[in-house]
């Protein structure tokens, strides 16, 4: 069994997928199993550069499992499929538009194993915002002790933590850290690059709710992370060492929006998986 399974959903973004796989192939942790679920119009796995990167991952001690699956039933179904294929204790959900510096997976694994929390994220920076400094959005709450369970309700003051993940705010705050120092900070939710404790994720139902969402939706990781934080806590690392390709989203409908949000299911999911936190405000 690999140290970590990297779960990678992709759809019609060959250029950014190549960027993502390049980061995967350079990780200091090499005992990895990459599971790709491709729902592109044409299979991306047949591209020569993609095949070369797959061979590189394998040559360094990893393995790659590729699935071409059409038609698409939405991103949450993709995540559910990938989770059902996973066997490692730790699973990294990695979007197909994120580049990781070589140390990222190692640091995420170290943090998850130390904290024994539900998840640890590494939020990517869009470097087109590198010169767009927004001090009013750079409020950060660090975990100075162990990561603990917490309730972060939509609309609460803690929900505003998401502002740190706008533009390049996290990148700018990270510049104040001494070289080589990492900090854990509190989140409302985190997207794009998240290492989960697989057993804990399954204990809150994973992404099995996919059939209740319309084809074009969002918020599936917001939902599961909210449940995980209530029971075991969650955090993110700074610096993140991840960078966003800043390409067009593939989870939106033709109007450029979504037809539903998974967070609408939060009240009943809390009742089912974290009932002891229902009354916490």
What annotation goes with each model-predicted range?
Residues 91:
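Short aromatic/hydrophobic "clamp" motif used to bind/position activated sugar donors
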Residues 95-99:
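The conserved acidic donor/metal-binding loop of glycosyltransferases
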Residues 69-86:
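Glycine-rich, basic loop-to-helix element that forms the pyrophosphate-binding segment
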Residues 103-162:
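Conserved donor NDP-sugar-binding/catalytic core segment of glycosyltransferases
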Residues 19, 182-199, 203-281:
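C-terminal catalytic/acceptor-binding lobe
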Residues 13-26:
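Short, well-formed alpha-helical segments that are part of the catalytic scaffolds
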Residues 25-67:
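Acidic donor-binding segment of Leloir-type glycosyltransferases
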Residues 152-169, 175-196:
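A recurrent flexible, glycine/aromatic-enriched loop bordering the glycosyltransferase active site
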